[in-house]
Design a protein with these regions (language model features):
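Short, charge-rich amphipathic alpha-helical segments embedded
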Residues: 113-138
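Conserved acidic-Pro-Pro-aromatic motif
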Residues: 1-107, 116
Length: 138
């Protein structure tokens, strides 16, 4: 919570969150999610979900073999992607690059490209070119 000023210009973040506290005073995913929503961020996608066996269950003599208990995850949070009109042209350009190369999120790319078309930053129907060539770009 102490980084609120630094987050004012942040477009996206990747966080490792825990589903339950592993360390003293560690916030859980629910607490992190609630806080980030209050400052304008929404979860976009999970990059990974780590599972753990519930003790004392051990599979194949390997205590690290994943069971079904959710332990922690890597998650991408974005400034509200439904309010792209609030972003500057430069922020849109940065976000579309992140969406494609870092988040592997073509649906977000298309949404941003459409916003960029409406602002005449790129040519009309460029989002269709992206859709047609998505496999070449990936």
């Amino acid at each position: 919570k102490n980084g609120r000023v630094k987050l004012q210009n942040c477009l996206a973040m990747q966080l490792e969150v825990s589903y339950f506290s592993l360390y003293e005073n560690q916030p859980t995913f629910g607490e992190v999610d609630t806080y980030l929503r209050t400052i304008g961020f929404l979860p976009h996608r999970f990059l990974s979900n780590k599972r753990w066996s519930i003790a004392p269950t051990i599979f194949n003599n390997d205590y690290r073999f994943p069971g079904n208990q959710l332990l922690e995850a890597d998650v991408i949070y974005l400034r509200n992607p439904l309010q792209l009109e609030e972003l500057t042209d430069n922020q849109l350009k940065k976000l579309v690059v992140m969406a494609h190369f870092l988040f592997e999120s073509p649906d977000l790319c298309v949404r941003i490209l459409i916003e960029m078309e409406q602002r005449k930053i790129i040519e009309r129907h460029d989002h269709n070119k992206y859709i047609s060539n998505i496999e070449k770009f990936s």
